[in-house]
């Protein structure tokens, strides 16, 4: 089980260094922050490319700590109050 990633959570990009998740669901928040999903953007311009295969929001897989971006980066933060496989 992995913590769900929210807007403002950290990521690490091998091309651009550390940054944060910038976009998420416009319709679904958790603990006051939009939930990040596959296709959402991080601060270096990369897109999230992996997420939970078991939970979708707006037809998109929910991103979790450890999921990846299209720059080869990794989401390094998640909210431990919501865990997904």
Which sequence ranges carry the predicted segments?
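Intrinsically disordered, low-complexity proline/glycine-rich segments
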Residues: 2-85
């Amino acid at each position: 089980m992995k913590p769900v990633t929210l807007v403002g959570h950290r990521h690490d990009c091998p091309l651009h260094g550390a940054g944060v998740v910038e976009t998420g669901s416009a319709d679904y928040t958790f603990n006051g922050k939009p939930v990040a999903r596959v296709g959402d953007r991080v601060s270096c311009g990369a897109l999230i490319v992996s997420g939970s295969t078991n939970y979708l929001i707006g037809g998109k897989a929910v991103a979790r700590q450890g999921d990846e971006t299209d720059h080869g980066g990794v989401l390094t933060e998640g909210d431990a109050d919501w865990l997904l496989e």
